[in-house]
Amino acid sequence: MAGAVATVSVGLAWLGLMAAAASATQFRVGGGRGWSVPDANAEPYNSWAGRMRFQIGDQLLFVYPKEMDAVVVVDQGAYDACNTSSSVAGGGGGRYDDGNTVFTFDRSGPFFFISGNEANCRAGEKLVVVVMADRGGRHAPPPSPPAVPPPVAPVPMPSPASSPPSPAPAAATPSLAPSPVATTPSPSPSVSPMAPAPAPTTSTPSSPPAPAAMAPSPSTTPGGVAQPPPPPGTDGANATTPAAPAANDRSGAAAAAPVVAGVVVTSLGAYIGYAMLAI
């Protein structure tokens, strides 16, 4: 991937250079006479340069005899002093002695050229060129290739077994204790005075009826025969039936039982006595 990006960047830069070269203008310094000491009738180099419009990407062509001359790119101080031993290092500067030098302007601003022969420089073989800033983008320098980013190491995928970190437990908000609710005491049940239990009635055994009055003595009938008295119980007026004891009073019945038995025995005895008398 990185190699492909670098190849594309170099290709774009090369295309930019080719486009700039195709639209650039090459100027021959000195015309047909070339790079040499100008004569009295020739136009000075700086006057010629002042009439030209130099753009970034334009070129200067220096033609000279390489055994006798050279081209030196210097700064303004060396230009004024014709110091051939001081050349500008880098940026297209330096000393050229190949006899057919092509110099390309790679920036805007002034450029200073002098002859490699000091005597020729002092005789007027020197040149100042001011390159104009490129306002229309015609000779824009080729874009520098973009920096190739370093390969990114693959991020290891987390294993399925690894569980995501558990979120920090949220701080428990202390719960407010509920305000105590005043409880109204329920009224205690009023104790109603209990009615006094009725006193148990003591069953008084009814007194046994008085024994029946002794039967009247047998009356004497007119015939002189003594009539026996009627049996007890036959005369409703004279017979006295003992009152039956209360059914629900067991203690009274138990107490009256001997009395009743005595009355019965007495009545039977009287009846038997009357019977004996009648016989």
UniProtKB/Swiss-Prot annotation:
Lipid bilayer topology: Lipid-anchor; GPI-anchor
GO cellular component, one term: plasma membrane
Propeptide, residue positions: 252-279
Subcellular location: Cell membrane
UniProt entry tagged with the keyword Lipid biosynthesis: no
Single GO MF annotation: electron transfer activity
PANTHER family reported for this sequence: BLUE COPPER PROTEIN, EARLY NODULIN-LIKE PROTEIN 9
Protein name, entry field: Early nodulin-like protein 18
Organism: Oryza sativa subsp. japonica
